[in-house]
Amino acid sequence: MDISNVLPASSLFLGIVPALIILYFTLKGYEEYFKDKKIFLSFVAGLLAGFFSIIFESFVRNFGVISLIILIPFFEQIVKTSILNSRLARGTEGAPIYGATLGLGFGSILTPFSIAIYASKWSGLEIVGLSIVTLGAIGFIFFHGATGIYIGYGVKSDRVWRYFIYAVLFQIPLMVVSLVSDEYNLEFLQVLIVVYSIILYWYAAKKVLIMTLPKSKRRKIVKE
């Protein structure tokens, strides 16, 4: 079944909808610690930053494997760091929350482009191939949400560059697996991306995000 004709417009929702669902559950219990306007701005900023990241990646793809493994993580994380270290989040209690929102928006825009790349290689999309590619793309949504939390925590705690470095280091193994999967058509490796990213997001959401709050408020969040 060739479904490539119905995907161009709808594929965007394959990224945005999961990102919004993840964001909804992440924000539960934190309602008094963020502003709705900044949540909206953070998500839109993530979408735009993700789009420009894809353009950047298209330029560096010809520079070799090492460039992809190093330059892309550096560029993507420095973009998120620059946004979060601005007036959007700096000096706010909810910086890690805005980081999660920014990262989820950033990751969501990668889904349609992942599908487009797959379609260009295989001149069409089959259900199984689409499912695998979408699964891997959702993994990147979790990943960028997690690194957004880490960077946001760095902004909150005035250790922004330390957590920026952590985010870059976290992304390098993800890039290696992604490139191997793409180069040798080992789509099943996308499962590793998802597992790695979900674990990273779970830890960031449960252990790092909550550390931004006073101890009394942390206990309240845990109970909820």
Language-model-detected regions and their locations in the chain:
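Hydrophobic alpha-helical segments at protein termini of multi-pass membrane proteins
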Residues: M1-E224
